[in-house]
Swiss-Prot record:
UniProt name for this protein: Interphotoreceptor matrix proteoglycan 1
Domain SEA intervals: 238-360, 574-687
Motif interval(s): Heparin- and hyaluronan-binding: 624-632
Glycosylated position list: 142, 442, 445, 595, 619, 633, 651
Cleavable signal peptide: 1-20
Pfam families: SEA (PF01390)
Record InterPro entries: IMPG (IPR039861), SEA_dom (IPR000082), SEA_dom_sf (IPR036364)
PTM entry text: Highly glycosylated (N- and O-linked carbohydrates and sialic acid).
Location within or outside the cell: Cell projection, Cilium, Photoreceptor outer segment; Secreted, Extracellular space, Extracellular matrix, Interphotoreceptor matrix; Photoreceptor inner segment
Organism: Rattus norvegicus
GO BP annotations listed: extracellular matrix organization; visual perception
Region (Disordered): 741-798
Record key words, sorted: Cell projection, Extracellular matrix, Glycoprotein, Heparin-binding, Hyaluronic acid, Receptor, Repeat, Secreted, Sialic acid, Signal
Amino acid sequence: MNLEIKHAILVLWIFLQVQGIKDTSTKTHSSGTKNIDKAPRIETTESTSAVHKASTMKRLFAVAKLRNKRSALFPAVNICPRESLRQILESLQEYYRLRVCQEIVWEAYRIFLDRVPDTEEYQDWVSLCQKETFCLFDIGKNFSNSQEHLDLLQQRIFQRSFSGRKDDMSPIEILGVPTTAPVLPIDVSSMSLRPFPLPPDDTDLKEVTIKDIQTPIAIRRAELESKPEPTHVTEISSEEKVEFSISLPNHRFKAELTNSRSPYYQELVGQSQLQLQKIFKKLPGFGEIRVLGFRPKKEEDGSSSTEIQLMAIFKRDHAESKGPESDLLSLDSNKIERERIHHGAIEDKQPEAYLTAADLKKLIIRLLDGDQPLVGGTVPFSDEVTEPLFRPVTQSELPKPLTDVTEDVTLSPELPFSEPRLESVDIYGPYLPDSSWSRPVTASTSGVGNLPSFTPSIFALDDQSSPPLMATGPTAFIPTLTLPISDYSTVRQWPLEVSHWPESSSDRELSTTSSHDTIRDLDEMDVSDTPALSEIAELSGYDSAPDRFLEMTTPIPTLQYVTXSSETIAAKGHELVVFFSLRVANMPFSYDLFNKSSLEYQALEQRFTDLLVPYLRSNLTGFKQLEILSFRNGSVIVNSKVRFAKAVPYNLTQAVRGVLEDLRSTAAQELNLEIESYSLDIEPADQADPCKFLDCGKFAQCIKNELTEEAECRCRQGHESHGTLEYQELNLCPPGKTCEASQGQATPCRPPDHSTNQARQPSVKKLQRQQNKVVKKRNSELSATDFEELDDQDWEGN
């Protein structure tokens, strides 16, 4: 009972408290209303600006309530509530690196390359930046040193007009018209017509020194001074001509240089054009370079030198052709002339290019040293000149007329096309005595017949009196042919690998320097002149038994080259030899190219010789000979061999590859020859197998001499040659002939195109007498189909 009373009292008390609070709030509201009514009214003259300001703030706060708030601490980063503080910080740092790297890479492409990057390359650079592979500023250095950036700068220097500098110059500086002769001397100390060295990056600015230039030079495209002042706009030309001169301080001026027909003049012109074309072709629009003449020059020390006057012609498209037809920019490498500006109707329309001393210096340095290194590596040529820069041409080196042919012969056919066999190569030693043949001598020209003009496939830079490069140990020589070629030719001398055979039209006796007064003609030779097979079996790489061969793989070459980045040295007593092959994709192959005596082979051989020899000679120090070994099918594959000195001041393989890559681009532009880059196969002799570049056919096998490292073709079992005495004991098939299948007995080697090119085959009297009528009839009736079927049967039987 008491508990219920207490509970009722508590409820009543709570009710009274709540009721009292309501009464108090009502009184307060009433008093506030009364006070407001008693207060004075706000005057209408008060400024309305405060009211407008308050309303604006209210609107801003209202709009802010509708906007999504951005986190001030974690922008664009999703924070998981379960992450720790350390994980949150790592996420922020990773996002920071991503955004910074994206901006850096994007700006690098925009500033240095002026283009939008591809997606893959952009992601690659961002990934490298995030992994801290490159420092932030190293990325900019990498882009600024890239070849694409340097090419872009080079194009802008030649194509962009620096018109913004015109207002900063005085009229005298812009016009560049002094009171005396308008010449500013510039000393280019290292400019010469030897192969230009590619110096290291830290020394390239020392190559060219520019003096006496204090103000910017405005080089203007003006008209030729020989033409009168123009009064109207002439036709727009597609060419722009640049005249300049080069000083040769160590080359004295000679009287022969005043006669443009003299051999010395022609040689110097050719060397100058070859050197400068390689450098100027890097400039956009370069067309050709012409030698205008030579003149003497006196140096500061009183010595005499030669100055070459040249003209470079650049081709322009119609968008860039804004100057008159006779636009000529006179740029002298030792003298930069400020040309007179013709005042006329076209003065305001001529584009101008203002170059400061720094711009001009960089331009000349880049022109001399070259921006792009050779593909496959830079060729580090030596700065020292061990020989005279230009050697006067002697009478013996001048091209000879066609009547100076020393022997009336033709070339034998080439071996048939077949893939080279590398798996089985035999090695043999010297196998012919010294008395077999004598060295070739010059015979009378009275019996010379009409021969097609062609050039042999070996060219050398040495004097004709020097010993033959291929003569090592006891060798045999065949009378050869001396033909009119350029100044780098010598008499062609072959050891065993002979491609020239005497004609059978008449018997000839040749005078020799040996103990014999005369040499017996081929028809008077006997088998006793040749050593028996048993006498040389110990030195040869195959068994003397006639029923089988000693097959062996190619051993490790004993010839080893010392190759470094700056030099290549051959073994003692040897020369540096490089084999290379290249493929011309847009040239159809003809089976006449298997026959070295065919006119098509000779013409193509001459074409590639004229193309390759000048490049190799002018760019590779120590170059001696180029020998075109053969042409193979596959469009046209050219197999060649190059001989050098015993030591050269550069990496031989990289240098040859670089020159051939450079030749490939030149041939594609000027000669329309598509030489495929991936087809270039370059191997030094100490690493290469010479049989790889020699085709012997299905019935022959390649063998290699241990001493001379030369490759030969030898008939396989059942296809031995019995028709030529000099090869019958050794089972060797002469170059240009193939081993022929036979039934029951071996038959002589025959040219690969016996049925179609019989008129051009070399014939020897001895072969004609030894071949009886039965053999001739069998050979003539042997068709191509029977030949192939019998070929396969014999091959399977072996």
